[in-house]
């Protein structure tokens, strides 16, 4: 079974958590794209969705699902998103698609964060296989990069990429994260950092892993 099939399996399994007449929060990325396609079959059973990226908004509209702004809702029943890495404590690295800030905003609207991944995304230590994305205000790029080097990382400017918020991304390589909640807070306190891709302070509540043996739900 290939990676795409495992992503589709996890996405399909997430539909069981969608409540009738609810507004669903959705993140961004390839696994979320699979979820949005699956959610299209339930378009008449839900009120709509709040999306964490412009790309996800477009896909939702193509499925005939009404899109709401995060400013239109006070809370969301569930938020469904993928991850670039996830550890056994359900903490994640996200931001490979450069939507990390909006993902954190939409995720903060729910108490039920459902992370859908294929089995290749599971790691023991965050930062083991995937660089940590950090969204930075453009004028602070070099200054923030120096701070990341001082913390032991190897930042690389993701050239040609501008976030939906008009900012740039630094990808921090060689940066194993032993204490994700503390590192998330420390990086967010650096002047010029909008946010970083560690999702530890608001970790997932439920993880659905697509495996060759089927979808595995971890609560």
UniProtKB/Swiss-Prot annotation:
A Pfam family that this protein carries is: Rib_5-P_isom_A
- Top EC class for this record: isomerase
Catalysis performed (reactions): aldehydo-D-ribose 5-phosphate = D-ribulose 5-phosphate
Query: What keywords tag this UniProt record?
Result: Isomerase
Please name the pathway. Carbohydrate degradation; pentose phosphate pathway; D-ribose 5-phosphate from D-ribulose 5-phosphate (non-oxidative stage): step 1/1
The residues listed in the UniProt record as binding substrate, with positions renumbered to this chain, are 28-31, 81-84, 94-97, 121
Give GO terms for biological process.
D-ribose metabolic process; pentose-phosphate shunt, non-oxidative branch
Q: What is its EC number?
A: 5.3.1.6
Q: Which residues form the active site?
A: 103 (proton acceptor)
Source organism, top-level taxon? Bacteria
Q: Its Gene Ontology molecular function terms?
A: ribose-5-phosphate isomerase activity
- Could you say which residues form the signal peptide? none
Instruction: Tell me which GO cellular component terms the UniProt record holds.
Output: cytosol
Share what the entry says about its subunit structure, partners included.
Homodimer.
NCBIfam families referenced in this protein's UniProt entry, alphabetically: PRK00702.1, rpiA
Query: What is the stated purpose of this protein?
Result: Catalyzes the reversible conversion of ribose-5-phosphate to ribulose 5-phosphate.
Similarity-based family: Belongs to the ribose 5-phosphate isomerase family.
Protein name, per record: Ribose-5-phosphate isomerase A
Q: Native species of this protein?
A: Actinobacillus succinogenes (strain ATCC 55618 / DSM 22257 / CCUG 43843 / 130Z)
User: According to the entry, what is the taxonomic lineage of the organism?
Assistant: Bacteria, Pseudomonadati, Pseudomonadota, Gammaproteobacteria, Pasteurellales
